[in-house]
Amino acid sequence: MYTRYSYNPSLGRTYVYDNKYYKNLGSVIKNANRKRHYIEHELEEKTLDPLDRYLVAEDPFLGPGKNQKLTLFKEIRNVKPDTMKLVVNWSGKEFLRETWTRFMEDSFPIVNDQEVMDVFLVINMRPTRPNRCFKFLAQHALRCDPDYVPHEVIRIVEPSYVGSNNEYRVSLAKRGGGCPVMNLHSEYTNSFEEFINRVIWENFYKPIVYVGTDSAEEEEILLEVSLVFKIKEFAPDAPLYNGPAY
């Protein structure tokens, strides 16, 4: 008669393994891969060490340079549910000569040499009716064929939600960035139409932007559309003053 503490040959023999010499096969393979990835990561970091001498802004909008805002227009638009509306068509009243002339005279002094580093299209959206609970949607395309005519209204397809400040910002700089024109005030004074086509659209994208809401009802929203110029300034060639105060 066997008890639970008796030795039963039919139960097989029991072996005790020394863990010092036996390891789990999966852990061995994982450790080998981990070491290999670590060595590759170290080599990759060494190749990037020379770049530590340079600084770059996480958000180009907050980078070096002066921001000059040109408000194109403020309008109230009605947006139906499940649809998005075109914001700017780049051929209407947003390019009034008076608006640009006032902006140029205030933002670009004649005595300074200034270069456009980047141009941002900034769209600020606000609901006109109180106590509305919805989020703003937006999507854009930077480039299209010159003869393409965008639709005024489209269906919502994979949009992105606008941030908490209800501001949608798009960088229009082409690859390489920057605008080679230095004396912007004189370039603009020569010809308004030529300045827009040759300076702005030659160096920056002309985007198509649609906005909408995730509301199930028709919403009335106030749009403020503006261009923000990121400007790099150069000191004017002015003679030094001589006198007791200097």
From Swiss-Prot:
Q: Which InterPro entries match?
A: Polyhedrin
- Offer an example of a GO molecular function term for this protein: structural molecule activity
| Record keyword Cytoplasm present | no
Q: Name one GO cellular component term.
A: viral occlusion body
User: Got any disulfides in this one, which pairs?
Assistant: none
Pfam family of this protein, just one? Polyhedrin
What keywords is this UniProt entry annotated with? Viral occlusion body
Family per similarity comment:
Belongs to the polyhedrin family.
State the protein's purpose: Major component of the virus occlusion bodies, which are large proteinaceous structures (polyhedra), that protect the virus from the outside environment for extended periods until they are ingested by insect larvae.
- Descriptive protein name: Polyhedrin
Q: Which organism is it from?
A: Mamestra brassicae nuclear polyhedrosis virus
User: Lineage of the native species?
Assistant: Viruses, Viruses incertae sedis, Naldaviricetes, Lefavirales, Baculoviridae
